[in-house]
Amino acid sequence: MDMNNPTPHHNLHFISQCFIKPHTIPEESKQPYYLSPWDLLMLSVQYIQKGLIYSKPPAALNDDGQFIEDLLRKLKHSLSIALVHFYPLAGRFATISYVDEGSCLVYVDCNNSPGAKFIHARLDMTISDILSPTDVPVIVQRLFDHDRATNHDGHSTSLLSIQITELLDGVFIGCSINHSLVDGSSYWNFFNMWSEIFQAEDDNFSISRPPVLQRWFPDAHGPILKLPFTNLDQFITKFEAPQLRERMFHFSPASLAVLKARANTEYKTNKISSFQSLSALVWRSITRARGLSPDQTTGCRLAINNRTRLNPPLPENYFGNSIQAIRTAATVKELLENNLGWAAWKLHEAVVNHDNEKVRDHVNKWVESPFVYRMEKLFDPLSVMMGSSPRFNKYGNVFGMGKALALRSGYAHKFDGKVSCYPGSEGGGSIVLELCLRPEFMSVLEADEEFMNATTPRDPLHYY
């Protein structure tokens, strides 16, 4: 799939768009909403774009549009209620420049904004057209708003955009949220709470996991954190993905148990997790597929939640970014000549060693010398990045159409070696990997016996 050429467009029709404001205006929303170091780090990367695909109820297939009309009305109303709790998502970024200091302050203005964006579109394709192909069709990118936008664009574009795309036999709910406001935990908590409100049909419903909007800042710093920039070109860049293929690979609970047992047996331990074993398999397999020289250094990075690693810990529902990418590395020769257990143990060590001291040290260094992440530097053609998490509640979001059939993502954060980890739709501990590679590397991976034998063959009657 050529990530830079999202064609053909098929017949995607944009029917309408509007902006949704909070149903009632919280008093706190009248104050500036300041960004933490973890939030500011994300200004030059892209929005989080995830979406769920649902089957239309049988009665909706020939009802002259009444079902979708009712669905849109309920989605808009429940979204307005959700935004009372998650009011920063209805705001816009604002910047104060301190030219004499050579610095600027970026924050969220929750007051002077039209609200969150809501789009209704129609696509003349079926669920099978989207989910059956071996590779994820490029049309999926167009099921999300804010395509290729950076988070800094949130000064002029909505921080949250919902695109509802009606298919011939289904509905795709695409949600784009500014990554300088949320990480994966906050993103899915918003999605989950919106679903709760939709199902409750009660404006006064008490959500089960209200977001904790109080900001976290390192000791003796904040809430005002200035960036040492005055011009956009000093810290904001656009990233264009190379030509890629994108595939979904399914791993059953039984297959993951075998991988875990193998890794622990090989390293003579019982501490390696299923996910660490799977990540080691992916790292080794992609490294083989790339045909790298034995003396080259390859790395594997894991996105890790800092909430529970701080002391004292942050609340589980802390709203905002609280993540880091931890990395382990080896020469290609070391990685491939040693076994799966050796690679999995290196990942295990990186995880267990990421503690309160490491987290605070990283943040304190940022305070001393602020910077932002740049996509082109996050992209390492010799390494693998494991993002998202199979622990997030991605299939508990019900919007009057039953359980979602599958999850797909947009253009954002795709590069060679990027892997996003999702729970399998059937549950039970299964995992689906969304894996992006250059076409020539994907072809080799598809012929890799160790990797493919660990996957579950595609079932034409079951999507993932």
Indicate residue ranges for each PLM-predicted region.
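Soluble acyl-CoA-dependent acyltransferase catalytic core bearing the H(X)4D motif
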Residues: 15-17, 25-31, 44-45, 49-88, ...
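Terminal membrane/secretory targeting segments in land-plant proteins
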Residues: 1-25, 45-46, 77, 457-464
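A signal for specific C-terminal beta-sheet/loop modules enriched in small/flexible residues
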Residues: 2, 125-134, 449-464
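Short, surface-exposed beta-strand/loop micro-motifs that present aromatic residues
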Residues: 41, 159-165, 416-424
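Low-complexity, glycine/alanine/valine/leucine- and proline-rich hydrophobic stretches
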Residues: 379-461
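Detector for long, low-complexity, acidic/polar
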Residues: 34-38
